[in-house]
Each structure stands twice: as C-alpha cells, then as structure tokens.
C-alpha cells in the first residue's frame, strides 16, 4: 500500500509504484518515476526526468535530478537513473545531465553518504560506497564495487576502475586502475586492494595474479605499454587481469595514475584457507 503524507507535494504526472512511502514535506516533481517499495523521506526533493529503482531510500534533504551545475546546459531533456536498493543519504546531491538525451546513472545496491555530490554526465556502477563529502565533477565514470573515502575530490572525466578503494581526503586527477588501493593529494597507488577483493570472495589465485600484475606494471622498470603486454602473456587466462589491461589501454582524457607509494607493502596475500605467506 502506497503511503503519501498529506504535507508532501507530488505533482500530477509523477509515476508512483506500489508500496511507496513519501514522508512529510518531501517534493516529487511531475516527470519523476518512483518504482515499487521506494521510500522518500522528509524534505527530500526529486526533480527532472528521474527514475528511482525498486527498494531505494532517499533520505531527508537529499536533492536529485535538479538542473546541472554546468554553464553549457541549455535546458535539454536529460535524465537521472538510480538503481535498486540504494541508500541516498542526507543532503546528497545528484544533478541531471548535460546535452540532449544523456543520463546520470547510479547502479544497484549503492550507498551514497551525506553531502556527497554527483555531477552531470557521471556514471556509477553497482555496489559502490561513497563516504561523506565525496565530490564527483562532471563526466566521471566509477566502476562496480568501488569504495571512496570521505572528502575526496574527483576531477572531471576521470575513470575509477572496478574494485578500487580510494582513501579519504585524496585528490583524484587521473584514472585509477581497477583492483587498486591508494590515497593522497597528489594521489599515490599503494598496491592491490587485497582486503576488498577477499571480502568480495575473489579467489586466492586471482588476487595473486593481480598483485604480480601490479608489480610488473608499476615497479618493474619496464615501459608502461610493454609491461601491459607481458602480463597478458603470463596471466591472460585470468579475466580480472585482462580487465585491468583493457582499462589501462582504453582512451583516456586524463591519463592513467602511475604515482606509487614506495613504502607500501606489496606482499602476496595470506589466505586462511590457502595456507601461509606465498613468495613471489
């Protein structure tokens, strides 16, 4: 049963699914679509051609689908699509896109914490966590299963690869390769996101191949392109390694981040099920 509080404003034309809850003083504009089981909490504001996926909760004072903060925007018809079972927390802002027919998209099962900002033409994958005050400029692409710590600023057109973990208070100016962990301003790669991969049940052999890939690409002294080719020869049967190489070879407006934290440990993982430390 849908429950809309009398003080909420839901404009004619808005599409409201089954079992939707809209709390006091929330505002839902005419072109919005709320799928089944969505909860819109008090004072939230949802505008534009915005679709909120099933089971997602929009927390108080979040703003979604409003005009992009981009001087190039001329009133074109653009879209926001938020997936299923997301949590968009207090005061988060997700603006609409720029240029006719384009979309700001967020995948399923994402947690967007308070005061995060996702700008025009961004795309965010599934199972992503943005901590408080994460700020994405326009055209940023974030892969699946990425975690970004508090107060991180991301330059426009940057790509952040799947399973990456970005430490708090970092400044991101270049593309972050998938499966990596790092921090800092300027940013420095610390190695492979070993703990994150283990939590996601990535097999031990895959994690080991990724660690050896990281060492070869960033610490061997080989040229960047030569090292990408050599890891494909040695570990090309591992899908995650192929994905890493493909990401690094894709066209990029910002370039790949290659700064390294030389003090970071690149020891191979210890896996309780696999036994003791594995030497390289």
From Swiss-Prot:
Keywords: Acyltransferase, Cytoplasm, Lipid A biosynthesis, Lipid biosynthesis, Lipid metabolism, Repeat, Transferase. Pfam families: Acetyltransf_11, Hexapep. It comes from the Bacteria. GO terms for cellular component: cytoplasm; membrane. PROSITE patterns: HEXAPEP_TRANSFERASES. Its EC number is 2.3.1.129. It catalyses: a (3R)-hydroxyacyl-[ACP] + UDP-N-acetyl-alpha-D-glucosamine = a UDP-3-O-[(3R)-3-hydroxyacyl]-N-acetyl-alpha-D-glucosamine + holo-[ACP]. Belongs to the transferase hexapeptide repeat family. LpxA subfamily. NCBIfam families: lipid_A_lpxA (TIGR01852), PRK05289.1 (NF003657). Homotrimer. This is Acyl-[acyl-carrier-protein]--UDP-N-acetylglucosamine O-acyltransferase. The gene is lpxA.
């Amino acid at each position: 049963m849908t429950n809309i509080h009398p003080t909420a404003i839901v404009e004619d034309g808005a599409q409201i699914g089954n079992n939707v809850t809209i709390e006091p003083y929330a505002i839902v504009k005419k072109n919005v679509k709320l799928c089944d089981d969505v909860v819109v909490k008090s004072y939230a504001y949802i505008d534009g051609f915005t679709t909120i996926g099933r089971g997602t909760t929009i927390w108080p004072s979040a703003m979604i689908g409003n005009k992009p903060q981009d001087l190039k925007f001329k009133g074109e018809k653009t879209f926001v699509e938020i997936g299923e079972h997301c949590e968009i927390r207090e005061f988060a802002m997700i603006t609409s896109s720029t240029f006719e027919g384009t979309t700001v998209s967020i995948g399923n099962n994402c947690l967007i914490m308070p005061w995060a900002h996702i700008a025009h033409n961004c795309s965010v994958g599934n199972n992503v966590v943005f901590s408080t005050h994460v700020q994405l400029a326009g055209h940023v692409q974030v892969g699946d299963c990425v975690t970004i710590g508090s107060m991180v600023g991301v330059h426009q057109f940057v790509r952040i690869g799947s399973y990456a973990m970005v430490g708090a208070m970092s400044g991101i100016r270049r593309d972050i390769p998938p499966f990596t962990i790092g921090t800092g301003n300027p940013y420095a790669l610390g190695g492979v996101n070993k703990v994150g991969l283990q939590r996601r049940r990535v097999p031990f052999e895959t994690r080991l191949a990724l660690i050896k890939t990281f060492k070869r690409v960033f610490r061997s002294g080989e040229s960047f392109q030569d090292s990408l080719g050599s890891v494909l020869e040695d570990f090309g049967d591992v899908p995650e390694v192929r994905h890493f190489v493909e990401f690094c070879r894709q066209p990029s407006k910002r370039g790949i981040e290659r700064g390294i934290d030389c003090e970071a440990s690149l020891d191979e993982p210890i896996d309780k099920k696999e036994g003791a430390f594995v030497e390289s």
